[in-house]
Amino acid sequence: MDLSELERDNTGRCRLSSPVPAVCRKEPCVLGVDEAGRGPVLGPMVYAICYCPLPRLADLEALKVADSKTLLESERERLFAKMEDTDFVGWALDVLSPNLISTSMLGRVKYNLNSLSHDTATGLIQYALDQGVNVTQVFVDTVGMPETYQARLQQSFPGIEVTVKAKADALYPVVSAASICAKVARDQAVKKWQFVEKLQDLDTDYGSGYPNDPKTKAWLKEHVEPVFGFPQFVRFSWRTAQTILEKEAEDVIWEDSASENQEGLRKITSYFLNEGSQARPRSSHRYFLERGLESATSL
């Protein structure tokens, strides 16, 4: 899998895809959706679609695709190569960088991981349609409540039969194939990650990348910078990363913080008071001050 585009810029999102097989434009196709890397504190999350003509679904099954989590890395790569060699299987994927995930989750307007996942999956299905793939059935491994997710996708694609289920990657071969594409891409992205920070003596033995992995936690503690925090390889919105920042990094006091602490929190209604102890005196306009004019309260 060629990830050179991602290696040039891994700070946002990157879409990669195979050529669309000619048969997939002519015959009705089934499409599967799955992801890899939703839980880790390190590295990107990858969403993938895989599709093939309905009459060739048995041929896809014959490749012995399975849930990527049950396969060794070498088996996943072998199966992906087999799919690449066929003339009836196509795929596409979105690589979402750790930086994109964290800034989305911590922005002024929150964009949580479920919403990001749903929108990414929807975007990939639409991408396949835009490329001319004759999609008639879609199977999706759920994120959140499957009924809600399915209703949302069905509304977006009313002419397509949509099925959303938990563990779909173990139930439907086309979703298993998508899970293999996603996992192969994520594994390669993590191995070949280009650190934009140009760090020296960087230890790349960071374990599985999952928050409960002791090796991953040790790597995070070793590579936190007291002022600037973590490299962009880290999802700084994850609780594990935030806890380490709170313990290891320097405290930051913003300009507004001091005045807020001195004044204390005020009720919002206090800003609308016209009289009383909390009312603030209003200063006159410069025009009146320069001329020694004051407001008359009585005649």
From Swiss-Prot:
PTM annotation (Phosphoserine): residues: 257, 277
Main location: nucleus
Modified positions (N-acetylmethionine) in chain numbering: 1
EC number: 3.1.26.4
UniProt KW keywords: Acetylation, Aicardi-Goutieres syndrome, Disease variant, Endonuclease, Hydrolase, Metal-binding, Nuclease, Nucleus, Phosphoprotein
Sample GO molecular function, one term: RNA binding
CDD domains: RNase_HII_eukaryota_like
Cofactor note: Manganese or magnesium. Binds 1 divalent metal ion per monomer in the absence of substrate. May bind a second metal ion after substrate binding.
Annotated a divalent metal cation binding sites: 34-35, 141
Effect of residue 37 to S: In AGS4; strongly impairs enzyme activity but not interaction with RNASEH2B and RNASEH2C
Domain RNase H type-2 positions: 28-250
Phenotype upon changing residue 67 to A: Loss of enzyme activity
Cofactor(s) for this UniProt protein: Mn(2+); Mg(2+)
Coiled-coil residue spans: none
Record PTM Phosphothreonine, positions in chain: 204, 216
GO biological process: DNA replication; DNA replication, removal of RNA primer; mismatch repair; RNA catabolic process
Annotated compartments: Nucleus
GO cellular component entries: cytosol; nucleoplasm; ribonuclease H2 complex
Reactions accelerated catalytically: Endonucleolytic cleavage to 5'-phosphomonoester
Function: Catalytic subunit of RNase HII, an endonuclease that specifically degrades the RNA of RNA:DNA hybrids. Participates in DNA replication, possibly by mediating the removal of lagging-strand Okazaki fragment RNA primers during DNA replication. Mediates the excision of single ribonucleotides from DNA:RNA duplexes.
Subunit structure: The RNase H2 complex is a heterotrimer composed of the catalytic subunit RNASEH2A and the non-catalytic subunits RNASEH2B and RNASEH2C.
PANTHER family: RIBONUCLEASE H2 SUBUNIT A
Sequence similarity: Belongs to the RNase HII family. Eukaryotic subfamily.
Linked pathology: Aicardi-Goutieres syndrome 4: A form of Aicardi-Goutieres syndrome, a genetically heterogeneous disease characterized by cerebral atrophy, leukoencephalopathy, intracranial calcifications, chronic cerebrospinal fluid (CSF) lymphocytosis, increased CSF alpha-interferon, and negative serologic investigations for common prenatal infection. Clinical features as thrombocytopenia, hepatosplenomegaly and elevated hepatic transaminases along with intermittent fever may erroneously suggest an infective process.
UniProt name for this protein: Ribonuclease H2 subunit A
Lineage, top ranks: Eukaryota, Metazoa, Chordata, Craniata, Vertebrata
This protein's encoding gene: RNASEH2A
